[in-house]
């Protein structure tokens, strides 16, 4: 069960000064708010304690990669340590190169109506994890 062993390893913390603390704080409140809509429902503890699978329709993307999976679904990836991703690969299938693109996707797919500052706050929060 190497998966559970991996969950026991703490994610590295974001370096001091690598994100804006004020914006990250507002982003955290926003992430947990807005009716607890995704991504908060996909990532309630910022990590996924077990297996959480989502259909392409749930997360607003095509089934190109999930169609090759036995379950035909995407796995929720941990959010902690996102700041360490240097080459993109964000989202359930790794399709986005930046966190800005992920936030924009959620804003459009879920019709959240985020203003630019809220988007920036969410990105800073994700960078802080």
Report residues per predicted region.
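Periplasmic c-type cytochrome electron-transfer domains
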Residues: 1-129
